[in-house]
Every structure is written in structure tokens, then in C-alpha cells.
């Protein structure tokens, strides 16, 4: 599964610096800046390219990587969809769940 689309969640996010790029990972969750409520949050925004990835997967050699920065606020751990996403990501990293990890 590796997450549903179009969900809203309040949480603190990381803003990645160079050399972060989508060119070597498959982003599974990112901020939707077309949403007025999300776009209105300007305090502390440092990225100028509008690319705010929150979770991704990638293959590294013979291994698999799952990264997710969700979880700064307590409410995140009460969201069944987020918990399912964590489980899917762990299963992907273990090799128990297939997912397309090609960058896009």
C-alpha cells in the first residue's frame, strides 16, 4: 500500500538541504503546497524549490531504505493510516512488501 493519497495531518516537518534530490529515491509523501492551508504556513520555510518530501523509499545496493519524518506530534501516532504506513515501510525495508522504488 505505502500510503493513501489526499490526507491531512498536522506535524512538524524537516526541510532537507543539499544534496537532497528526488533523482535517487521514490517520494511517497510530500507537502501539497496547492492546499491554501499548507501554503499559508511561511514561518521557517527555507526551501525555495517547493519540494518538501516527508517520506521515501529507495534501493541501496542489495538493501532497501524506508525513511519517514512524520511523528513529531502525538496526534500522528493516533492516526491509523500513519501506523499502517510505518508498517508497510518496515515490511518494504525487510523485503516482505514489494513497491516501485524507481525515482519519479
Briefly describe each language-model feature range.
Residues 1-61:
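Catalytic beta-strand/loop cores that center a nucleophilic Ser/Cys/Thr
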Amino acid at each position: 500500500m505505502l500510503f493513501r493519497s489526499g490526507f491531512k495531518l498536522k506535524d512538524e516537518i524537516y526541510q532537507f538541504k543539499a544534496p537532497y534530490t528526488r533523482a535517487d529515491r521514490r517520494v511517497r509523501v510530500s507537502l501539497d503546497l496547492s492546499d491554501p492551508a499548507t501554503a499559508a504556513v511561511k514561518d521557517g520555510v527555507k526551501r525555495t524549490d517547493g519540494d518538501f518530501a516527508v517520506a521515501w523509499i529507495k534501493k541501496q545496493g542489495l538493501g532497501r531504505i524506508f525513511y519517514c519524518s512524520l511523528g513529531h506530534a502525538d496526534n500522528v501516532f493516533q492516526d491509523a493510516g500513519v501506523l499502517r504506513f510505518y508498517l508497510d515501510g518496515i515490511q518494504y525495508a525487510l523485503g516482505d512488501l514489494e513497491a516501485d522504488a524507481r525515482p519519479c
